[in-house]
Design a protein with these regions (language model features):
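Residue cluster at the C-terminal edge of the helix-turn-helix DNA-binding motif
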Residues: 25, 34, 48-56, 129
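Alpha-helical linker/hinge and terminal dimerization helices associated
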Residues: 52-53, 74-96, 295, 306-309
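N-terminal winged-helix
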Residues: 98-129
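Residues within the DNA-recognition helix of helix-turn-helix
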Residues: 38, 45-48
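C-terminal regulatory
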Residues: 171-245, 250-274, 301-320
Length: 320
């Protein structure tokens, strides 16, 4: 089906960005909050875009939001267009050595509450260099989403526990995160002392998969546990653990209040404790080259300084 759209105007770019936001957020409600516009205006944007293109992009209504094949193609083309526009703006800005625009940072949920995380200090350092000419947009998500957002250009920088390798993506270790296996009040193992819990008993109880993190752990706890529910992210894991339905892994720093209140407990930390690396992720190429290089250096510097103050050495660099 051919499109009626022969030239792309500023209006078309705005409409396409609204459409892409709806797709990225999985529906109108989340996109409305992200764009800070009413749902009626967002709906009008989509309707206008469909009229200008000459075909329907998606189904919406009581049944929810569902993409059509035409919508899938327009979405992919729009993402490529946005990336090209961003690269053009960055190149033009760098001709005059100007640092301006918007930088998107994707962070894994609960990363900020880790005492070892120095992202706020890094952002402060970055802000002292560029002032308010650069707008920061920070989005919280699951690890595999963070790296995929960086890989496809939706985000310029990521901070995540994910160690998945992607083309044209560079990673550098910042600090380690400790995770332990937990169960909630009401779980059969909750009141059983650790010394009475065997590996066989652990394996007999449903385990909540962490999705993207399972590939990094080939121990008993991914090979032999009974398949349970799936919790993508620390908060999702906590919801399932608190329900008493599953055993599950959560970063230790995210559980402190719940442990103190007796809602959850760590199970056999002597054999279940896991250490996972937190990394800064960026593309080798892409828009805002100087800006991203500066931001990345601020992130690495903030964590290296913290590491040295703690008596450790700066983390080594690695690329993927």
């Amino acid at each position: 089906m051919s499109s009626k759209l022969k030239q792309v105007t500023d209006l078309d770019l705005r409409l396409l960005r609204s459409f892409a936001e709806i797709v990225d957020r999985g529906g109108f409600a989340a996109a409305q909050a992200a764009l800070n516009i009413s749902q009626s205006v967002l709906s009008e944007h989509l309707k206008t875009l469909e009229i200008r293109l000459g075909y329907v992009l998606c189904k919406r209504g009581p049944g929810g939001f569902k993409m059509l094949p035409e919508g899938e193609r327009v979405y992919k083309a729009a993402k490529q267009l946005f990336l090209a526009v961003d690269e053009f703006k960055a190149d033009i800005g760098e001709i005059g050595d100007e640092m301006s625009g918007e930088v998107v940072i994707a962070i894994e949920d609960e990363i900020i509450t880790n005492p070892a995380c120095r992202l706020p200090e890094a952002l402060q350092m970055f802000g002292e260099r560029v002032g308010r000419r650069v707008r920061l947009r920070v989005e919280s998500m699951v690890g595999y989403q963070a790296i995929s957002h960086v890989a496809d250009g939706s985000a310029h920088l990521g901070i995540s526990v994910s160690d998945v390798r992607a083309r044209d993506v560079a990673t550098q270790h910042l600090f380690d995160e400790v995770a332990e296996l937990y169960c909630g009040q009401g779980h059969p193992l909750f009141d059983v002392p650790d010394h009475e819990i065997s590996e066989a008993q652990l394996a007999a109880h449903p385990y909540s998969s962490r999705g993207h993190l399972e590939s990094r752990d080939v121990s008993l706890f991914t090979r032999e546990f009974r398949a349970g529910d799936v919790g993508l992210g620390a908060q999702a894991q906590l919801a399932l653990i608190l329900s008493g339905r599953n055993l599950g892994y959560v970063p230790v720093h995210a559980t402190t209040p719940l442990v103190a209140r007796g809602r959850i407990r760590s199970v056999r930390p002597d054999i279940t404790r896991r250490v996972v690396p937190i990394q800064v992720i960026s593309r080798d190429t892409g828009p805002h080259g100087k800006l991203i290089a500066l931001l990345r250096s601020c992130v690495v510097m903030a964590h290296s300084t913290a590491s040295m103050h703690a008596g450790g050495a700066p983390a080594p660099a690695s690329t993927g």
